[in-house]
Regions:
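Beta1-alpha1 glycine-rich phosphate/pyrophosphate-binding loop at the start
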Residues: 2-73, 135
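FAD-binding core/adjacent interface of flavoenzyme oxidoreductases
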Residues: 1-5, 61-135
């Protein structure tokens, strides 16, 4: 049985877990995320803030319990990966080493770029990508 680690659980991490599960029904998949939420779609945060979606609408793939059951993954939320030993194929998350893994995917996402235009540093001006940003 193969083992997989996915670091980051945004859209890319979720789609990777789906793809792995589609090819390997029995492999162990460990997903590590610095937040304890289901993967969200960053573009939907604005719909939530203007009231066009409820909070759950930002999570188009389902709830975290639904996803972990459907894909049979072990989710390690609130455990950012702070170390990686590529040679030994191990990770450090939550203060402890995990692994080894046969394959490791780093899908930690992006950060918003705020251009240095006049007003970018005014109160209330901010990037919005995450559910926490939308709150």
């Amino acid at each position: 049985m193969s083992s997989y680690a996915i670091i980051g659980f945004g859209c890319a991490g979720y789609q990777a877990a789906r793809a792995i599960r589609g090819r390997d029904e029995s492999g162990a998949i460990d997903v590590f995320s610095d937040v304890g939420l289901a993967p969200s779609n960053p573009m939907l945060t604005t719909y939530y803030t203007k009231g066009a979606l409820d909070y759950t609408g930002m999570f188009p793939f389902g709830t975290l319990p639904q996803i972990t059951e459907q894909l049979s993954i072990r989710f390690h939320g609130g455990q950012p990966v702070t170390g990686l030993d590529a040679k030994r194929r191990t990770l450090v998350a939550g203060g402890r080493e995990t692994g080894p893994y046969d394959k490791i995917l780093i899908s930690t996402g992006a950060s918003a770029f705020v251009p240095p235009i006049p007003g970018h540093d005014l109160p209330g001006v901010m990037p919005m990508r995450t559910a926490a940003d939308a709150e």
